[in-house]
Structure formats: C-alpha cells, structure tokens
C-alpha cells in the first residue's frame, strides 16, 4: 500500500508543477502592438504593415544624444516592450544623469501607415508632460525609410515638438529594407530590340530549314536557307568595304601608251636595194 501511495503523490506533484509552469508562461508572454480602435475593426492595411515589420520584433534599437547633464538615451522596439520597468512601453527616454525613465510611447496605442518607400510607426499613450503641451500624453513618431542594404539600422532622434498646445510628439528616424517597395524589373529598349531580333533570326533559320527540307527536298548543307548568299556574304562585305574605304581607283592607267598600226610608217623597200648585188 505504501509504494502505491508514494507513486500517486509523485504524479500529483508533477501535474501541479506542470500547471504552474503553464500559468507562468502565459503570464510572461510578451505583449505586442495593439492598434488604435476596436479589435474587430482594425485596418487590414495596418495589420499587414505590422506583419511586414515582424522580422524586427526581436530587435532592440538604442541611440544616445546630448552632452553632460542633458544626455539622454532612447530605447526603441517594434511591437515589443522596450523596458522592464514600464508596462507596455515601446519607446523610452532615459536621463543619463539620474537614470530617470520616461515613457515616450506605448505599444498598446499603435498607429501605422506607409508610402511608396517609407513606413510611419506611431506609439501613443506615453507619460504626461509636466508643463508643456497642455500636460497631454507623450507620443513617439518613428519614420522608417527605405534602405535596401540593411534590415534595420541608423535609429536616431530627430526632434521634439513641444511648442504647441496639443499634438506634441517626438520624431525619430530609422533605415530598413522592409520599408522598400518590391523592385519591378523593366527591359530596356535595347534589350527588347535584341529579343525581337533573336526571335526573327530563329524563325528565319527554323522556317527556312523546314522549307528547304520538306518542300525543296534539299539535304545536307543545302537545307540552310539562302546558302549561296551566306557563302558569298564575305565577298560582298569585302567589296562594300573596298568601295567605301578606298580613295584611289582600283585600276591605275599605265604610264605608257601603245602605238597603233596606223601610226607606224611604211618601210621603204628601196632603202635596202643598194645592198643587193648588181
């Protein structure tokens, strides 16, 4: 009886530990972006853009600006919490002089849209201003520009707009290939003409070969269309080059002239008569 009792206790303990582990895993599951608006009425375009940025979810970006006591560090993550101290913070500002952390924007108030070669990611719901912008909540605007040579780089703060009564924001920029539009390849005019020429040559050779073989009944090299012309093409090209390039006539007249029979005088037979014997 005692062995069975110990076995049951072990199994119950294992089941209890498994239940606790599952519960803890649910609790520590990372939060993700929650688009502005009701869950069932979210923009399909915004959902598609967030899915497009998924390769950046596990990356963290940091940039430090300022000097001395005015040195600030900004930590940014895409649809993930950027801080362990502030719940839901997607972009935080840390004052290096006193390590004070300020939430610039939270991922539970996300808005995103894009253009041809850029994506604008906005985190709302940050910490409230103390004395600026009507004490409204801070807002982070991250401009992701197209750069086909990097997945994500060059995260930098650009400016802080807090001189207005409302709608203030922090502006940041970053480069990523995910913001680029798909490349559409177009053939140049020369390539199109080359393809057309090659197609015509192929049709000429194949069609002429079939005609010579099936209609004319030619065999061997005679099946090639216009064989005599192509065999004599070299001579034709040479004659054309000779005609265009030569500056002197091919047949230069001789420096002497022949004498015609009509120009020869009649030889007198009497001049030799004195040589005959008397």
Curated annotation (Swiss-Prot):
It comes from the Eukaryota. Residues 257-278 are annotated as: Disordered. GO terms for molecular function: protein domain specific binding; retromer complex binding. The chain crosses the membrane at residues 187-211. Residues 212-278 are cytoplasmic. Residues 31-182 form the MRH domain. Glycans are attached at residues 58, 84, 95, 108, 114. The modification Phosphoserine is found at residue 268. PANTHER family: CATION-DEPENDENT MANNOSE-6-PHOSPHATE RECEPTOR (PTHR15071:SF29), MANNOSE-6-PHOSPHATE RECEPTOR FAMILY MEMBER (PTHR15071). This receptor has optimal binding in the presence of divalent cations. Transport of phosphorylated lysosomal enzymes from the Golgi complex and the cell surface to lysosomes. Lysosomal enzymes bearing phosphomannosyl residues bind specifically to mannose-6-phosphate receptors in the Golgi apparatus and the resulting receptor-ligand complex is transported to an acidic prelyosomal compartment where the low pH mediates the dissociation of the complex. This is Cation-dependent mannose-6-phosphate receptor. It comes from Mus musculus.
């Amino acid at each position: 009886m005692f062995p069975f009792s110990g076995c049951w206790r072990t199994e119950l303990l294992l089941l209890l530990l498994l239940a606790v582990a599952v519960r803890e895993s649910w609790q520590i599951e990372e939060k993700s972006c929650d688009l502005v608006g009701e869950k069932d009425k979210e923009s399909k375009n915004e959902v598609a853009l967030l899915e497009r940025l998924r390769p950046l979810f596990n990356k963290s970006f940091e940039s430090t600006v300022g000097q001395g006591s005015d040195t600030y560090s900004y930590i940014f993550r895409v649809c993930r919490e950027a801080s362990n101290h502030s719940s839901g913070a997607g972009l935080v500002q840390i004052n290096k002089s006193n390590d004070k952390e300020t939430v610039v924007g939270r991922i539970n108030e996300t808005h995103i849209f894009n253009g041809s070669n850029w994506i604008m990611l906005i985190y709302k719901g940050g910490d409230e201003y103390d004395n600026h912008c009507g004490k409204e909540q801070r807002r982070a605007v991250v401009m992701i520009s197209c750069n086909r040579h990097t997945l994500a780089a060059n995260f930098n703060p650009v400016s802080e707009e807090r001189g207005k009564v409302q709608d203030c924001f922090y502006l940041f920029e970053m480069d990523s290939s995910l913001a680029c539009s798909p490349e559409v390849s177009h053939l140049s005019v020369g390539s199109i003409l080359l393809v057309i020429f090659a197609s015509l040559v192929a049709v000429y050779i194949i069609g002429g070969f079939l005609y010579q073989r099936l209609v004319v009944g030619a065999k061997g090299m005679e099946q090639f269309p216009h064989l005599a012309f192509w065999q004599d093409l070299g001579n034709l090209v040479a004659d054309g080059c000779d005609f265009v390039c030569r500056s002197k006539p091919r047949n230069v007249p001789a420096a002497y002239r022949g004498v015609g029979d009509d120009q020869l005088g009649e030889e007198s037979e009497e001049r030799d008569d004195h040589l005959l014997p008397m």
